[in-house]
Amino acid sequence: MSFDPNLLHNNGHNGYPNGTSAALRETGVIEKLLTSYGFIQCSERQARLFFHCSQYNGNLQDLKVGDDVEFEVSSDRRTGKPIAIKLVKIKPEIHPEERMNGQVVCAVPHNLESKSPAAPGQSPTGSVCYERNGEVFYLTYTSEDVEGNVQLETGDKINFVIDNNKHTGAVSARNIMLLKKKQARYQGVVCAMKEAFGFIERGDVVKEIFFHYSEFKGDLETLQPGDDVEFTIKDRNGKEVATDVRLLPQGTVIFEDISIEHFEGTVTKVIPKVPSKNQNDPLPGRIKVDFVIPKELPFGDKDTKSKVTLLEGDHVRFNISTDRRDKLERATNIEVLSNTFQFTNEAREMGVIAAMRDGFGFIKCVDRDARMFFHFSEILDGNQLHIADEVEFTVVPDMLSAQRNHAIRIKKLPKGTVSFHSHSDHRFLGTVEKEATFSNPKTTSPNKGKDKEAEDGIIAYDDCGVKLTIAFQAKDVEGSTSPQIGDKVEFSISDKQRPGQQIATCVRLLGRNSNSKRLLGYVATLKDNFGFIETANHDKEIFFHYSEFSGDVDSLELGDMVEYSLSKGKGNKVSAEKVNKTHSVNGITEEANPTIYSGKVIRPLRGVDPTQIEYQGMIEIVEEGDMKGEVYPFGIVGMANKGDCLQKGESVKFQLCVLGQNAQTMAYNITPLRRATVECVKDQFGFINYEVGDSKKLFFHVKEVQDGIELQAGDEVEFSVILNQRTGKCSACNVWRVCEGPKAVAAPRPDRLVNRLKNITLDDASAPRLMVLRQPRGPDNSMGFGAERKIRQAGVID
């Protein structure tokens, strides 16, 4: 619209179109205000009039939308449309103010830079609410309606006056006063919990805040470190504390944004295994990244994907984490790249997995004699290792013990990569000059040092007329028997991967030294595939395997005299070999003392109680006399019945005899004194009231009862106890009846059985009744069935 102010003169317009000269003034409200013109909404009639800013009598800067004005109406000379002229701003009427209490529902936006700017003369609005008679009413307001330099926030408590625009009828809030700021709620994650208090890592700033358990609104038993919470901050004794702590759904609080893209870099500083006392940096590690502008990113001990040791120079892949609170960037999800060993200065070694335990294992090294300890956490690429897997690793000193090494950064290799020896197919013959020994077998734990190191043996051999010697290890011996000094052996020569070292491998025993000493002993124990021999001095037992016995093993019995040689097997354990049965008499004097003594077993043989250390049993004389209380040892030879199982506390009778090469006086011809009653007899077996070990009853088979007597419950018997060496269970043998027990009297049939049928009543008279036709007779006077059972043809009736 174009407008010429010069058209407004006495001849250019009049008050109304009818030409009346009286100038009537009207009132209205500024509805729209632009740079040079605006529009007025008339109060007395439905009309919207144009006005030019030059027609305003006053400072145009004070005029704003919503102001009441008084004006005259004229007409545009060119268009004939009514326009407002001679505008005067009307002072607002003073009304009695009723102030209301309410709160901010939606605050006026503080920053409108990102939004389209408001039109000139228009202000952004917010909303408030108040309650009256149980109803809630909402009003708009602008920042100009707020008293004082106060920035209102949603939730603030306020006091205001309700303003009713008489021209537009719009209701709004004005003269707004702030009563109480809303308490801010903060979020965070519980990072530590003590006995009565804890700490929360705040989500708005990089800081921890204290809270007492009494401030937690919920079940304290469910609160754990890592839970998301919200809280209010209050000042107590000059320190900020968290109050009104409440749980939030898991995942509500997010501290950082992790990049989707992966980056690669080089480790320039590793995290020390043992942090120094003055180290305060929570992210001590550094990774150099080759961006357009190279930069170093920090990382902490929780930023690696695995617990594999990082070394300086490692090539790694990672994500970048950006903290939302302070925009700090760090490397996270760090994993070692497979080609990293091309860039580090570490010396890599190879070996084979030799043993696996719970969380750790041992590697048999190519370049070292000792097995190398390792933790499962040091396995690269998340591979699952098994015994005999070939691996590559780095050896570093243990941080806790400088004398020990362990393997780190273990990488699985393809089968066939690792080779310990390169040996020829040629076999050599030689004689053992020094025996090889194993290390102490109790060194499987990584926390225990070795008590005794393994020692190499020496073999003398002849090569093209030249007498030479070569070392061999006990682990390279084939079979279960270790060669001894003077034994003939066959072996191969192997070059180790360590240069200049040769060792005998695949050592096989060909023959024992013919001059080796032969020993005598007595069979003390027989198991499934092995046994024990009592030495000639009757004070020890020697292990032997049935494969070392020359003859039929089934012919061996307890107490048999045998001849054998001693050898050292794996683990430096002594065992008997070349065991032969012999009938020579050795070790027992011609005459035993004829006096028979009564005694009590105070310690059984080790075969009866494997938990005891000593092999020999001990018997104490209990009969009155000068020898009462004296104690004598005994072995398997001293038993009258070699299969008898003497237990601690049993009464025995015995003689004394000088036995063994050291002429020791021992108990001999020992016979137990056992009496007990028969508990019950079944078909082919029974039980005796006699306690053996954990069992209260002793089993016996009827074939063990002497003279073919049929035992009855209550009979008193004498017997021997034998121990089944294979099953470990005891049973009675050689059972003699000493006296007969009381006869069992047949009890009459109970009346309840005789009268049962008589007591049956049936309420239904038509129901079938059971009637006794004849009384049954006993088997001695039985009539039985008169009709003989015959084979009948189906379908044919006689």
Swiss-Prot record:
Positions carrying Phosphoserine: S123, S276, S514, S584
GO cellular component, one term: cytosol
Span of domain CSD: 26-87, 136-179, 186-245, 297-337, 349-410, 447-507, 519-579, 610-670, 674-735
Compartments in which it is found: Cytoplasm; Cytoplasm, Stress granule; Cytoplasm, P-body
Keywords per UniProt: Acetylation, Cytoplasm, Isopeptide bond, Phosphoprotein, Repeat, RNA-binding, Ubl conjugation
GO molecular function annotations of the record: lncRNA binding; RISC complex binding; RNA stem-loop binding
Start and end residues of each SUZ-C domain: 748-789
GO biological process, any: positive regulation of cytoplasmic translation
Disulfide bridge map: none
Entry-annotated residues carrying N6-acetyllysine: K81
Residues bearing PTM Phosphothreonine: T761
Cross-link (Glycyl lysine isopeptide (Lys-Gly) (interchain with G-Cter in SUMO2)): K91
Similarity section: Belongs to the UNR family.
Known role: RNA-binding protein involved in translationally coupled mRNA turnover. Implicated with other RNA-binding proteins in the cytoplasmic deadenylation/translational and decay interplay of the FOS mRNA mediated by the major coding-region determinant of instability (mCRD) domain. Required for efficient formation of stress granules.
Subunit field text: Component of a multi subunit autoregulatory ribonucleoprotein complex (ARC), at least composed of IGF2BP1, PABPC1 and CSDE1. Interacts with STRAP. Part of a complex associated with the FOS mCRD domain and consisting of PABPC1, PAIP1, HNRPD and SYNCRIP. The interaction with PABPC1 is direct and RNA-independent. Interacts with EIF4ENIF1/4E-T.
This protein's name: Cold shock domain-containing protein E1
Species of origin: Rattus norvegicus
Protein encoded by which gene: Csde1
